[in-house]
Amino acid sequence: MEQKQMQENSYDESQIQVLEGLEAVRKRPGMYIGSTSGKGLHHLVWEIVDNSIDEALAGYCDEINVSIEEDNSIRVTDNGRGIPVGIQEKMGRPAVEVIMTVLHAGGKFGGGGYKVSGGLHGVGASVVNALSTELEVFVHREGKIHYQKYERGIPVADLKVIGDTDQTGTITRFKPDPEIFQETTVYEFDTLATRMRELAFLNRNIKLTIEDKREHKQKKEFHYEGGIKSYVEHLNRSKQPIHEEPVYVEGSKDGIQVEVSLQYNEGYTNNIYSFTNNIHTYEGGTHEVGFKTALTRVINDYGRKNSILKDADSNLTGEDVREGLTAIVSIKHPNPQFEGQTKTKLGNSEARTITESVFSEAFEKFLLENPNVARKIVEKGTMAARARVAAKKARELTRRKSALEVSSLPGKLADCSSKDPAISEIYIVEGDSAGGSAKQGRDRHFQAILPLKGKIINVEKARLDKILSNDEVRTIITAIGTNIGGDFDIEKARYHKVIIMTDADVDGAHIRTLLLTFFYRYMRQIIEHGYIYIAQPPLFKVQQGKKIQYAYNEKELEKILAELPAQPKPGIQRYKGLGEMNPTQLWETTMDPEVRSLLQVSLQDAIEADETFEILMGDKVEPRRNFIQENAKYVKNLDI
């Protein structure tokens, strides 16, 4: 890129500040990258990419490439100014070496180097270096290529010049240390691509490329001129928008930049995603509160002034005006304060005021200029308000006065005797016959059984009042005890294991998906707390004489058959449904904690989960067809 703003805002070794040493990182890596699981492994990539993004935010870089090399190392290349290579005064070493070997050294702490920076907690390159068996850095700067190599954070040799160049930028290649990342050191292309796409949406001037050079070669390029406006269109691509063009707002005040884009659709759920300096603020925060407050106020004001809301009508609540809303709120803040359980909640009070004023002014203008769209938005809110009132009545009917009242449920729930949620589990079972076997086979002390008669309602296509009129949904809500939506309380969960047990056929998979959609939309916290599990009943029963063995997949079946003597010929039964097993078999294979296998449902990426549920369970056929075609190659067992 051309040398813009260089004089007024130099970035050299004098900008690099040093805060503390590196020894602790290898001892307690979780403190610096969250965990040493696959999540922490991928976090290493973002620490390096975030440094390149900082260069882009400062206006010096417009291309970032990430490649997974054949040896599973990662190479990150940018065309920024290149990390400074001059001697850093305090340490007496080249600035690039200080950045790579000293914790909390970098240009993002003083304010002179970068006005706004992303890198989570600014731990940066030194942590990646400490947790890698080897790291190489190539700096293209001032006409020379500077090179240094490190092993587990320690320089192998001094920084040296290895050639001439007419370009600027930094190339970092690192290989994660298997001593630290014992679970896995294998990078997932899709995980990296998802975040690269998100960064491209959030930073409209950057072209990001991700390439996999391993066996299954693939490459993706992301560059969105529309920025977060394109992001909203992407998120709504499988929905029916109420207005064609997403609303886009930007403004800044006191060094804080605010961008908001939103679009309403015909659906009933809302998806608001907020970001600060490219970090997804999962727990929301002041910027999100400012946006929601402005949205509710502006829509109510417009509805009143234009007599869409009558004098006798109550004001629409935030919940009402957010029905069917997809929105991105992205701010760039020079000094963000993060709080909350996972440090993903913005705490700066000024971010609320600035977001509120920037957004409300522009959104008022949008409604005035688009009266037809404005009317649709207000009317959608009034419909949601009616449904909310109806749902409240329905909810009051289902609300139990005490945990003991479950016994009065009409013969559905066979509860356990334990009242300790930490050891109690509930099996949600498909069909009465399987429910009967499960009731007889269970351990009554800690296992409760809830049989479902049929398929529960598809919550993706219905408003809350309709959902709450569904018997199966009401029974599930009452049995689990947490309530739903705004009244949800995780402390009231009666079981810390909610186990979905369905047949291993297409119908079973559909029921499982309907249940997961319901839990995701209305009880998301029980997924986030790790309370939802999927039972794994066996697919095959192998009997030879009196000896019976169970196989949970084709591979296990092959292994069992290979180990059995040829005579007498073993009998193989393929289970189509849970009802084919007697109570003892169901206990031995699927319910006994000593031998059973359970899949825990986790939520890695809320945005991706949201898209997937919308594609699979929403109204539009085309996105669903595309999803099936793209994922068909991963299907192992097809039940036709």
UniProtKB/Swiss-Prot annotation:
<dbReference type="GO" id="GO:0005694">
    <property type="term" value="C:chromosome"/>
</dbReference>
<feature type="binding site">
    <location>
        <position position="503"/>
    </location>
    <ligand>
        <name>Mg(2+) 1</name>
    </ligand>
</feature>
<keyword id="KW-0963">Cytoplasm</keyword>
<keyword id="KW-0238">DNA-binding</keyword>
<dbReference type="InterPro" id="IPR000565">
    <property type="entry name" value="Topo_IIA_B"/>
</dbReference>
<dbReference type="InterPro" id="IPR014721">
    <property type="entry name" value="Ribsml_uS5_D2-typ_fold_subgr"/>
</dbReference>
<dbReference type="InterPro" id="IPR002288">
    <property type="entry name" value="DNA_gyrase_B_C"/>
</dbReference>
<keyword id="KW-0413">Isomerase</keyword>
<keyword id="KW-0547">Nucleotide-binding</keyword>
<keyword id="KW-0460">Magnesium</keyword>
<dbReference type="InterPro" id="IPR018522">
    <property type="entry name" value="TopoIIA_CS"/>
</dbReference>
<keyword id="KW-0067">ATP-binding</keyword>
<dbReference type="GO" id="GO:0006265">
    <property type="term" value="P:DNA topological change"/>
</dbReference>
<dbReference type="GO" id="GO:0034335">
    <property type="term" value="F:DNA negative supercoiling activity"/>
</dbReference>
<protein>
    <recommendedName>
        <fullName>DNA gyrase subunit B</fullName>
        <ecNumber>5.6.2.2</ecNumber>
    </recommendedName>
</protein>
<keyword id="KW-0799">Topoisomerase</keyword>
<comment type="function">
    <text>A type II topoisomerase that negatively supercoils closed circular double-stranded (ds) DNA in an ATP-dependent manner to modulate DNA topology and maintain chromosomes in an underwound state. Negative supercoiling favors strand separation, and DNA replication, transcription, recombination and repair, all of which involve strand separation. Also able to catalyze the interconversion of other topological isomers of dsDNA rings, including catenanes and knotted rings. Type II topoisomerases break and join 2 DNA strands simultaneously in an ATP-dependent manner.</text>
</comment>
<feature type="site" description="Interaction with DNA">
    <location>
        <position position="455"/>
    </location>
</feature>
<dbReference type="GO" id="GO:0003677">
    <property type="term" value="F:DNA binding"/>
</dbReference>
<comment type="subunit">
    <text>Heterotetramer, composed of two GyrA and two GyrB chains. In the heterotetramer, GyrA contains the active site tyrosine that forms a transient covalent intermediate with DNA, while GyrB binds cofactors and catalyzes ATP hydrolysis.</text>
</comment>
<dbReference type="GO" id="GO:0006261">
    <property type="term" value="P:DNA-templated DNA replication"/>
</dbReference>
<dbReference type="Pfam" id="PF00986">
    <property type="entry name" value="DNA_gyraseB_C"/>
</dbReference>
<dbReference type="InterPro" id="IPR020568">
    <property type="entry name" value="Ribosomal_Su5_D2-typ_SF"/>
</dbReference>
<dbReference type="InterPro" id="IPR013759">
    <property type="entry name" value="Topo_IIA_B_C"/>
</dbReference>
<dbReference type="GO" id="GO:0005524">
    <property type="term" value="F:ATP binding"/>
</dbReference>
<feature type="domain" description="Toprim">
    <location>
        <begin position="424"/>
        <end position="538"/>
    </location>
</feature>
<dbReference type="InterPro" id="IPR001241">
    <property type="entry name" value="Topo_IIA"/>
</dbReference>
<dbReference type="InterPro" id="IPR011557">
    <property type="entry name" value="GyrB"/>
</dbReference>
<dbReference type="GO" id="GO:0005737">
    <property type="term" value="C:cytoplasm"/>
</dbReference>
<feature type="binding site">
    <location>
        <position position="430"/>
    </location>
    <ligand>
        <name>Mg(2+) 1</name>
    </ligand>
</feature>
<feature type="binding site">
    <location>
        <position position="505"/>
    </location>
    <ligand>
        <name>Mg(2+) 2</name>
    </ligand>
</feature>
<dbReference type="Pfam" id="PF00204">
    <property type="entry name" value="DNA_gyraseB"/>
</dbReference>
<dbReference type="GO" id="GO:0046872">
    <property type="term" value="F:metal ion binding"/>
</dbReference>
<keyword id="KW-0479">Metal-binding</keyword>
<dbReference type="InterPro" id="IPR036890">
    <property type="entry name" value="HATPase_C_sf"/>
</dbReference>
<dbReference type="Pfam" id="PF01751">
    <property type="entry name" value="Toprim"/>
</dbReference>
<feature type="site" description="Interaction with DNA">
    <location>
        <position position="458"/>
    </location>
</feature>
<dbReference type="InterPro" id="IPR034160">
    <property type="entry name" value="TOPRIM_GyrB"/>
</dbReference>
<dbReference type="InterPro" id="IPR013506">
    <property type="entry name" value="Topo_IIA_bsu_dom2"/>
</dbReference>
<dbReference type="InterPro" id="IPR006171">
    <property type="entry name" value="TOPRIM_dom"/>
</dbReference>
<dbReference type="InterPro" id="IPR013760">
    <property type="entry name" value="Topo_IIA-like_dom_sf"/>
</dbReference>
<feature type="binding site">
    <location>
        <position position="503"/>
    </location>
    <ligand>
        <name>Mg(2+) 2</name>
    </ligand>
</feature>
